[in-house]
């Protein structure tokens, strides 16, 4: 188990985040295709499927997590809808976008977090 022996909520979230970020390759396609289990088995997924996996893993160990959605401008110039995860840690929501190794728990570097269009948060991703 990835979080065995880890006690703090933040450290558990970080361990799960790093697993998905570092072990699940990014693949470009729209909407959820594989879901959490399929993404884990295949070892790759888009933002939706990577988020599905991370949220499922978080909830399986008792962490509170949800899906965040928006239209984001990436550092590559791509301007597109995107999905990432938010963990509830220490009384606040902390971002977690596992689609880039440049990102860390609470820090997104692969798209402009100051100019995205918020499209809401979800307990269950609608697509």
Which residues make up each language-model segment?
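Secondary-structure boundary elements
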Residues: 1-45, 53-55, 120-127
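Detector for Asparagine
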Residues: 7, 31, 46, 103, ...
């Amino acid at each position: 188990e990835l979080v065995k022996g880890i006690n703090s909520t933040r450290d558990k979230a970080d361990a799960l985040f790093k697993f998905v970020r570092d072990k699940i390759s990014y693949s470009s396609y729209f909407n959820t295709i594989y879901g959490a289990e399929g993404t884990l088995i295949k070892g790759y997924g888009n933002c939706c499927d990577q988020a599905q996996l991370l949220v499922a893993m978080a909830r399986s160990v008792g962490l509170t997590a949800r899906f965040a959605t928006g239209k984001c401008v990436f550092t590559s110039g791509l301007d597109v809808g995107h999905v990432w995860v938010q963990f509830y840690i220490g009384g606040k929501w902390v971002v977690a976008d596992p689609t880039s190794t440049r990102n860390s728990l609470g820090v997104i570097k692969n798209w402009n977090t100051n100019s995205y269009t918020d499209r809401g948060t979800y307990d269950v991703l609608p697509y």
